[in-house]
Structure formats: structure tokens, C-alpha cells
């Protein structure tokens, strides 16, 4: 996620320099249950303003950044643990395993099971 800092497009609006780092840090620390309204409260910003600022700075919305974090962590866990796909789904913040499978396939182009089988590192 930190890679998004080099894609910042501040344009004519000026954002607090550390805002993006604060957002990304929050996602890193609260990926299981992080909520945009909680982040806004912590940082003291209006939800609509912060949503727009995140999109402008990264090209992605808050939910997309959160999903990227969750899915990349899930991929790491698939390759480096023996946890079940269902357990990994819950570990990264998805209560609905079917939804997790769908998002994983959309993001990586293959199912979690196929990902583990094709890219497996011996554990």
C-alpha cells in the first residue's frame, strides 16, 4: 500500500502531507475491521472530504485499498501457512467465504485453491 505514495496527484488542492501515510497506516493496522467513518473520526475529517482526498491521492477508494491489503495478505497466508482457505478468509476480515473467493478470483485471476496449488512454497 505504501507504493501508492509515489502516485499521489495533489493537483490544485493541498492535502496534509502525512494524510496518505495516516490512511495507509490505519489500513495496515485495522485491515480486519477498519471502517472509513472510524478513520474520519480519528483523523478529524469529514467522511465525504476524506473519501474524495483518498481517491484523488491514490486513484483508488478506501474500500479498494482495504481490499488490496486483505487480498495480498490472504495470498501471503495461502503460500506460507497451512491454514484453511476459510480460516484465511476470516483472518483477513471476510466473514463470507464465498465473497472472499469471488474477490480473490477477480483480483488474482484464479481461485485461492488454485493460487495455493500453482504458487505453493513448501511450508
Positions of the model-derived regions?
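Basic, amphipathic alpha-helical hairpins
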Residues: 1-12, 22-38, 53-54, 58, ...
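Basic/polar phosphate-binding segments, predominantly the helix-turn-helix DNA-binding elements
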Residues: 33, 37-69, 89-114
Amino acid at each position: 500500500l505504501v507504493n501508492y505514495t509515489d502516485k499521489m496527484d495533489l493537483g490544485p488542492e493541498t492535502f496534509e502531507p502525512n494524510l496518505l501515510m495516516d490512511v495507509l497506516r490505519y489500513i495496515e493496522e485495522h485491515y480486519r475491521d477498519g471502517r472509513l467513518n472510524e478513520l474520519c473520526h480519528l483523523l478529524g475529517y469529514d467522511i465525504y472530504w476524506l473519501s474524495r482526498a483518498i481517491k484523488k491521492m491514490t486513484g483508488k477508494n478506501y474500500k479498494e485499498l482495504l481490499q488490496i491489503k486483505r487480498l495480498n495478505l490472504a495470498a501471503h497466508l495461502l503460500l506460507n501457512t497451512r491454514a484453511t482457505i476459510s480460516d484465511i478468509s476470516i483472518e483477513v476480515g471476510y466473514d463470507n467465504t464465498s465473497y472472499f473467493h469471488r474477490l480473490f478470483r477477480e483480483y488474482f485471476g484464479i481461485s485461492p485453491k488454485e493460487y495455493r496449488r500453482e504458487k505453493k512454497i513448501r511450508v
